[in-house]
């Protein structure tokens, strides 16, 4: 069993045990009308748009420094991030919907609920906690699930980042006409990353979609390796959480887009 299938099994058990219904019943609703649109930001931004992540740990990383997360969000905002990603999985990533709820009020930037969504109820909880964007991972969804969840999220006025790991999944993302597509550079079987995976997947990409490179981006040299793939933005977590000088580091990553 891969780590991803293990996580999905865990999410299914949470759904069956009423975890998400309890969250919906107990979390105070956070209004997100003041949130900016990430897609609008991409359209207007001549430089790469940055989704800056709040992350405590992952199945492969356990030694991230503890940060004042309110200050981290403020720094992301101040130094040029275009959106914030907040992990809400408790078991594998030490996140929570309560954390999302507390931090989303600290910024007007779009906030992505990064989780493993397989059911509309999870989308309801994400929205109630104050997310303005959600993540859908093509690899863990059937075509019908992907279409239904995508359309449901859009109907709830949420933006959707559809994540792909290979060219076949990219074609599946095109089928639902996903406007915002994330290319994950992590090998799902071995959980290792290669940033140039983005170049391979986007070699024959379609126009009229926006592309975000995710995972394995540690510095400006990594960004330069994938800039000519025609990406519109980056999702970066670990490198930002480790950085003690965001005022210099974050602007370095916001390179001029290269349209291929």
UniProtKB/Swiss-Prot annotation:
One of its GO terms (biological process) is L-tryptophan biosynthetic process. Its EC number is 4.1.1.48. GO terms for molecular function: indole-3-glycerol-phosphate synthase activity; phosphoribosylanthranilate isomerase activity. Keywords: Amino-acid biosynthesis, Aromatic amino acid biosynthesis, Decarboxylase, Lyase, Tryptophan biosynthesis. It comes from the Bacteria. InterPro entries: Aldolase_TIM, Indole-3-glycerol_P_synth, Indole-3-glycerol_P_synth_dom, Indole-3-GlycerolPSynthase_CS, RibuloseP-bd_barrel. PROSITE patterns: IGPS. Pfam families: IGPS. It is an enzyme of class 4 (lyase). It catalyses: 1-(2-carboxyphenylamino)-1-deoxy-D-ribulose 5-phosphate + H(+) = (1S,2R)-1-C-(indol-3-yl)glycerol 3-phosphate + CO2 + H2O. Pathway: Amino-acid biosynthesis; L-tryptophan biosynthesis; L-tryptophan from chorismate: step 4/5. The keyword Amino-acid biosynthesis applies. The keyword NADP does not apply. Belongs to the TrpC family. This is Indole-3-glycerol phosphate synthase.
């Amino acid at each position: 069993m891969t780590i991803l299938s293990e996580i999905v099994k865990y999410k299914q058990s949470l759904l069956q045990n009423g975890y998400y219904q309890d969250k919906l019943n107990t979390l105070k609703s956070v209004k997100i009308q003041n949130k900016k649109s990430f897609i609008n930001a991409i359209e207007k931004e001549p430089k790469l748009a940055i989704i800056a992540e709040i992350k405590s740990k992952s199945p492969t990383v356990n030694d991230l420094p503890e940060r004042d997360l309110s200050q981290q969000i403020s720094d992301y905002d101040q130094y040029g991030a275009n959106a914030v990603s907040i992990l809400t999985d408790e078991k594998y990533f030490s996140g929570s919907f309560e954390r999302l709820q507390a931090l989303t009020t600290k910024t007007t930037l779009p906030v992505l609920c990064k989780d493993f969504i397989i059911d509309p109820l999870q989308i309801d909880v994400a929205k109630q906690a104050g997310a303005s964007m959600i993540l859908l991972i093509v690899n863990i969804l059937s075509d019908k699930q992907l279409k239904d969840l995508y359309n449901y999220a859009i109907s709830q006025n949420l933006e959707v980042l559809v994540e792909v790991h290979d060219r076949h999944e990219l074609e599946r993302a095109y089928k639902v006409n996903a406007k915002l597509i994330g290319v994950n550079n992590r090998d799902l079987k071995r959980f290792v990353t290669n940033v140039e995976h983005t170049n391979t997947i986007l070699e024959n990409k379609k126009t009229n979609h926006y592309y975000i490179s995710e995972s394995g981006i540690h510095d400006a040299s990594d960004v330069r390796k994938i800039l000519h793939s025609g990406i519109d933005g980056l999702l970066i977590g670990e490198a930002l959480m480790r950085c003690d000088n965001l005022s210099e580091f974050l602007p370095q990553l916001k390179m001029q887009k290269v349209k291929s």
